[in-house]
Amino acid sequence: MAVTKLDVQYLRKMTGAGVMDCRNALREAEGNYDKAVEVIRKKGKVIASKRESREASEGCVLASSKQGFASIVAVKCETDFVAKGEDFVDMVRKILSVTLENKPRTIEDLNDLFIDGRRICEWITERSGISGEKMELGIYEYLEAPYTVAYVHPGNKLAVIVGFNQVIVKTQVARDVAMQIAAMNPISVDKNSIPAKIVEREEKIAREKAIEQGKPEAILDRIVNGALNKYYKEYTLLLQNFVKDPKITIDDYLKGQSRDLTVIEFRRINLNME
């Protein structure tokens, strides 16, 4: 049977496949849309499997929050051209929406949830076959708190989610903190939450440096403590100078809004550093 332009357009809307792929699938399926969709899916899986060994070094990362739950999703692909395409970004948005509605605990749990009647891992594989590039769900992070905020830096390569200890936080204040994390890349909320191994490493580095410089043993501990305090100020969120007002720290900024307001936890994902 003859395949019309309208038939091809309809199938493209259903699958996102290219014009020739849709035309050939309709011919193979003798005009049956459901069969044509299956033809495209099977072809997509074959193409995707051939690309498994390729490196997916580009991608798109998005974040959002809803009613005390915030999540970050990153889907990886091979080229920046695909990563910036509206179809690819929309795919990540759909996955992100699923996380807000279902609150999965692991990336494996997320892969097993459904979009358009298919498991997300299978859905991505089909999209991979259609696009001709390897695609994979690369990162999933979430947090829960009385108040949450999400921030996505322009370009969709860097995203942050933050949880606060109070239910009511001014939108601009929450956004300021999220943007601070994006810009300054702290490794923890405060010094008490820095892993012990990192503290030990910094102590060792500071002590060895002081000894190499011939500093008296009597003041080594003081030098080490000074180096640690400098490290804490640079890499812990609450002790960092506020980017928008360097005369105060983030802790000062939060306390200026509400005496007990603080950050419980945060996540920061930068695809360029993964």
UniProtKB/Swiss-Prot annotation:
Its main location: cytoplasm. It comes from the Bacteria. Residues 79-82 are annotated as: Involved in Mg(2+) ion dislocation from EF-Tu. One of its GO terms (molecular function) is translation elongation factor activity. Keywords: Cytoplasm, Elongation factor, Protein biosynthesis. GO terms for cellular component: cytoplasm. Pfam families: EF_TS. It is found in: Cytoplasm. The keyword S-adenosyl-L-methionine does not apply. HAMAP family: EF_Ts. Belongs to the EF-Ts family. Associates with the EF-Tu.GDP complex and induces the exchange of GDP to GTP. It remains bound to the aminoacyl-tRNA.EF-Tu.GTP complex up to the GTP hydrolysis stage on the ribosome. NCBIfam families: tsf. This is Elongation factor Ts. It comes from Azobacteroides pseudotrichonymphae genomovar. CFP2.
